[in-house]
Amino acid sequence: MRRQNITIHGSTGTIGKSALSVIAQSNNQHKVFALSAKSKIKTLFNQIKRFNPKYAVVLDEDKAKQLSDLCVKNKISTKILHGVESYEYISSDRRVDCVLSGISGTSALKPTYAAIRSGKKLLLANKESLIMSGELMMKAAQKSGSQIIPIDSEHNALFQILSPMFKTSQINLKKRKDIAQIILTASGGPFLNF
């Protein structure tokens, strides 16, 4: 079986670190193709040393230069890129099989959409992308064949509960009467004690 190439957005955050931990234990089933982070250069550099991705991306050009200098100094061949366009590039590169979107907030919108448009399997921890542009994202997924898998706790629980029903045609959401309402309780975030 061919190893799956994966891009991890937000690799220095909690979800990204957890994903890399799983990959490290996956018996070479996955290859880290690219990593991205906002600003934690030291953590990202350590991840680059361990996983040897083809690309690493940070938003800021100065931080990208710092990271590039560290890689050159340590004879590491990972190509360092910067900017939102580079986030999109590592989401849509033809060699990528799977994209994990672990970036928080609205900055995940463009790389997430790029992954979906390119037909990638998308492991989505970022809820904001669907909240802001759900209809656009779902239409793009239908057109490209992209599979979107929610990996954040509550959303993944719903996915695990509902997806077997979709596979056996027990529910038809197009009629919008098989499931009238889904209620998510707040387990964290800004609305926990609201």
List the predicted regions and their residue ranges.
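N-terminal Rossmann-like dinucleotide-binding module
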Residues: M1-A56
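Residue-level signal for inorganic ion chemistry
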Residues: T12, I48, V99, G119, ...
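Active-site-proximal loop->helix
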Residues: S18-N27, N46-Q47, L130-S146, I161-P164
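Short acidic-hydrophobic, aromatic-tinged amphipathic segments that line or gate anion-handling sites
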Residues: V57-L59, K79-S86
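Rossmann-fold NAD(P)-binding glycine/threonine-rich loop
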Residues: L67, G105-S118, K127-S146
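Conserved anion/nucleotide-ligand pocket segment
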Residues: A157, I161-F194
